[in-house]
Amino acid sequence: MSAQPVDIQIFGRSLRVNCPPDQRDALNQAADDLNQRLQDLKVRTRVTNTEQLVFIAALNISYELTQEKAKTRDYAASMEQRIRMLQQTIEQALLDQGRITEKTGQNFE
């Protein structure tokens, strides 16, 4: 699918961007989110300069993305550790099962 031009409104300004048709809803949702962030910033900071608000919003979004990446890395490391521990537990259980089988002469097939 090729990208098609889409008109969106951000902070009272029209912007035409190219977007694949299957991502149009996500683009509109992102534009709505950015609009809301800019409105909230304008109220909270009392900054009226649009360019300044956009830079502050961009910095906030970048910070949030950095935090989410760190969370994802931490979660992945935690899962890797849990998987290693589970593998060790399974390997030990299989070794123990093999020892029990050798002593009793039973096979559990």
From Swiss-Prot:
Ranges in coiled-coil conformation: 21-97
Any one Pfam family match given in the protein's UniProt record, by short name: ZapA
Subunit structure: Homodimer. Interacts with FtsZ.
Gene3D superfamilies: 1.20.5.50, Cell division protein ZapA protomer, N-terminal domain
Compartments it resides in: Cytoplasm
GO biological process, one term: septin ring assembly
Signal peptide: none
Keywords: Cell cycle, Cell division, Coiled coil, Cytoplasm, Septation
Described purpose of this protein according to its UniProt entry: Activator of cell division through the inhibition of FtsZ GTPase activity, therefore promoting FtsZ assembly into bundles of protofilaments necessary for the formation of the division Z ring. It is recruited early at mid-cell but it is not essential for cell division.
Gene transcribed to yield this protein: zapA
Family as reported in the entry's similarity comment: Belongs to the ZapA family. Type 1 subfamily.
Name assigned to this protein: Cell division protein ZapA
A GO-annotated cellular component: cell division site
InterPro entries in alphabetical order: Cell_div_ZapA-like (IPR007838), Cell_div_ZapA-like_sf (IPR036192), Cell_div_ZapA_eubact (IPR023771), Cell_div_ZapA_N (IPR042233)
Lineage top rank: taxon: Bacteria
